[in-house]
């Protein structure tokens, strides 16, 4: 009888361990938040990225739930052109001295099987918070052949209107205010 009780308790403990959400820490060396923005109303597209990002994802594949919190260092903006980088950080555009970070906080809202397919949340940038939906274009977890630990990777896309956040530089010159976001990230279980 005691063996049956012990076996049942062990089975319950194992089942709850498998069902528990896992917290993943984003790997800054494998996280690439990039964007594409209009220059002079269709003259060209300017592409850039942010070099410094941190965050975490809580993911429960069995419950099909999860959340994410990401912080981007605005001072790490990189167009590949130092003068443009400095202009983007200035009070005329991002005002990085006053608003040094952008943050996204959201929850997974759609799944494709057990993989998240969409996250809805809020983006805070330039002191303004607005709802944003992120489309999760791909999501995969594997055991890394290098570290022998689990790692998950994701490709995310969205489009925002930067004027909604008070970052409307160039509107008087006809700059389209829509910005396409393309984000690649990898993370591993925390701890």
Regions found by a protein language model. Give the residues of each.
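Gram-negative bacterial Sec-dependent N-terminal signal peptides
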Residues: 1-18
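Low-complexity, acidic/polar, glycine-enriched regions of mature
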Residues: 19-191
């Amino acid at each position: 009888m005691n063996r049956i009780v012990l076996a049942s308790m062990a089975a319950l403990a194992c089942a709850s361990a498998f069902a528990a959400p896992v917290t993943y820490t984003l790997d800054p060396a494998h996280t690439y938040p990039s964007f594409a923005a209009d220059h002079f109303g269709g003259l060209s597209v300017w592409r850039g990225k942010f070099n410094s990002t941190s965050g975490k994802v809580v993911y429960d594949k069995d419950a099909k739930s999860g959340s994410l919190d990401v912080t981007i260092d605005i001072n790490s903006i990189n167009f590949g052109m130092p003068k443009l980088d400095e202009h983007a950080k200035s009070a005329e555009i991002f005002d990085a001295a006053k608003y040094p970070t952008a943050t996204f906080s959201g929850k997974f809202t759609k799944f494709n099987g057990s993989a998240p397919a969409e996250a809805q949340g809020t983006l805070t940038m330039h002191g303004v918070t607005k709802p944003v939906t992120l489309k999760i274009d791909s999501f995969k977890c594997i055991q890394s052949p290098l570290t022998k630990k689990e790692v998950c990777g994701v490709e995310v896309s969205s489009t925002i209107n930067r004027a909604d956040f008070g970052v409307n530089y160039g509107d008087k010159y006809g700059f389209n205010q829509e910005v396409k976001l393309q984000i690649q990230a990898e993370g591993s279980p925390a701890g």
